Amino acid sequence: MSRKGKLPISLPNGVEVKVSNTEVAVKGPKGALTQKLIPGVNVNVEGNEVLVSLADEEAKLAHFHGLYRTLIHNMVVGTTEGFEKKLEMIGVGYRAAVQGDLLDLQLGFSHPCKLPIPKGLAVKVDKNTLITISGFDKHLVGQFAATVRSQRPPEPYQGKGIRYAGEFVRKKAGKAAAKK
């Protein structure tokens, strides 16, 4: 039995959880999310708490106990508070702008990188180099932030590129000059 999986999920006011045989639906003030369940994982709503349990304590299902508890907890937190990721752009001439439903990135290439912003996400750009991605689906926020970062990941010699706010990038020493 998982230590995380045993913990109950408390439901704040305004959050509604519906459980069917194959999926869990969470509806809150910021939006609604659904998660499919595999056979053998049971979800019960008891008053103000959600409990995740296994049909039997098989080793095959034990992996999913903590996973589904965390996924449902992230759905509850997302529909009430939301999630946010911040990215920093470091480099001469690197800048970003939001144009309608596109994120326009100038990253030193001969062409601008235009990324479509997924539905359900809000993207804000401050000072042309700070990108804030927010939404109620943790997976979608993290995936889009990773997609933006992958356009120009930080390089190890000068540290130029797109990085998560607060991310530490190890720098390498440059090539030593040859002695004559």
UniProtKB/Swiss-Prot annotation:
Record function comment: This protein binds to the 23S rRNA, and is important in its secondary structure. It is located near the subunit interface in the base of the L7/L12 stalk, and near the tRNA binding site of the peptidyltransferase center.
Swiss-Prot/TrEMBL GO biological process terms: cytoplasmic translation
Pfam families assigned to the protein according to its UniProt record, in alphabetical order: Ribosomal_L6 (PF00347)
GO molecular-function terms, A-Z: rRNA binding; structural constituent of ribosome
Superkingdom of origin: Bacteria
GO CC terms, sorted: cytosolic large ribosomal subunit
Keywords: Ribonucleoprotein, Ribosomal protein, RNA-binding, rRNA-binding
Protein name in UniProt: Large ribosomal subunit protein uL6
Protein family (similarity comment): Belongs to the universal ribosomal protein uL6 family.
Subunit relationships: Part of the 50S ribosomal subunit.
InterPro entries listed in its UniProt record: Ribosomal_uL6-like, Ribosomal_uL6-like_a/b-dom_sf, Ribosomal_uL6_a/b-dom, Ribosomal_uL6_bac-type
